[in-house]
C-alpha cells in the first residue's frame, strides 16, 4: 500500500504535523510541452510535492497540547485528528452516519438496545487489531464521571450498559430512548492498552500520525 504524506502547517501559530495516508498515490496527468524554466518551476512547486505524495494545508490556529481525541477541544485539532481516528460510525460530507470501525448495526424496536458488529480485520496504526474490548473501553472512558479531568465527558454514555457478545459484537443497553445516541458513536475508538495518545496518537483512520513540530514555518 502506497503512503502519502500530509503536512499540516499552522498559518497563525505555525505548528506542523505530518500524517501519512494509506491508499493510492496521486496521479500527475500533465500533457504537452514546456520550456526548461517552466519545467523547473513545476519540479520545485506544488505539483512536484503532490507527485511525491506530500500536501501542505494551512490551519488558522495552533493544535492542542494533547492529540488524544478524547481530550482535544480546539477546532483545528479536531479537523486534523478527524483524519486519524474513527468511531463505530463516521459522518460523511453530507452529515450522514456510516459504519466505520463497525460493519453494521441494528437498533431494537424500543430504541434501547444498539448492537454493532465490528468490521473484520480493522487495525490501529500500530498494527494491533481492533477488539470489542477497545470499543467498550473507549466509550466507557468518555462516560466515566471519575475519569481524569482532561477527558471530555459524553453524557450520553454515562448510564449506558456496554457489553460484548462473541468475538466481534458490542452492545449498548440504554435506560431510555435517545434519538441522538448514534451520533455519539462517532467518538474515536482507541486501543485500550496504548498509553502514548497525547504525543503519538494511534487510530484507525485513513491517515496515520507521523510527527509534530511546533513553531515550524
Residue positions per predicted region:
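N-terminal lobe/hinge region of extracytoplasmic solute-binding protein
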Residues: 58-107, 140, 202-204
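Aromatic- and charge-enriched surface segment that lines or borders ligand/interaction sites
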Residues: 103-147
Amino acid at each position: 500500500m502506497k503512503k502519502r504524506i500530509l503536512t499540516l502547517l499552522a498559518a497563525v501559530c505555525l505548528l506542523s504535523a505530518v500524517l501519512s495516508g494509506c491508499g493510492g498515490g496521486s496521479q500527475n496527468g500533465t500533457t504537452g510541452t514546456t520550456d526548461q524554466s517552466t519545467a523547473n518551476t513545476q519540479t520545485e512547486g506544488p505539483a512536484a510535492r503532490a507527485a511525491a505524495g506530500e500536501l501542505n494545508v494551512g490551519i488558522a490556529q495552533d493544535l492542542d497540547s494533547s492529540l488524544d481525541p478524547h481530550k482535544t477541544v480546539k477546532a483545528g485539532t479536531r479537523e486534523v485528528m478527524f483524519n486519524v481516528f474513527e468511531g463505530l460510525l463516521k459522518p460523511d460530507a453530507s452529515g450522514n452516519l456510516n459504519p466505520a470501525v463497525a460493519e453494521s448495526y441494528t437498533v431494537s424496536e424500543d430504541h434501547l438496545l444498539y448492537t454493532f458488529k465490528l468490521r473484520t480485520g480493522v487495525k490501529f496504526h500500530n498494527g494491533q487489531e481492533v477488539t470489542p474490548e477497545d470499543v467498550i473501553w473507549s466509550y466507557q472512558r468518555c462516560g466515566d464521571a471519575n475519569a481524569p479531568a482532561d477527558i471530555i465527558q459524553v453524557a450520553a454514555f454515562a448510564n449506558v450498559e456496554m457489553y460484548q457478545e462473541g468475538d466481534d459484537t458490542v452492545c449498548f443497553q440504554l435506560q431510555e430512548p435517545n434519538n441522538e445516541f448514534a451520533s455519539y458513536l462517532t467518538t474515536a475508538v482507541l486501543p485500550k492498552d496504548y498509553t502514548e495518545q497525547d504525543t503519538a496518537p494511534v487510530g484507525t483512520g485513513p491517515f496515520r500520525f507521523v510527527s509534530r513540530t511546533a513553531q515550524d514555518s
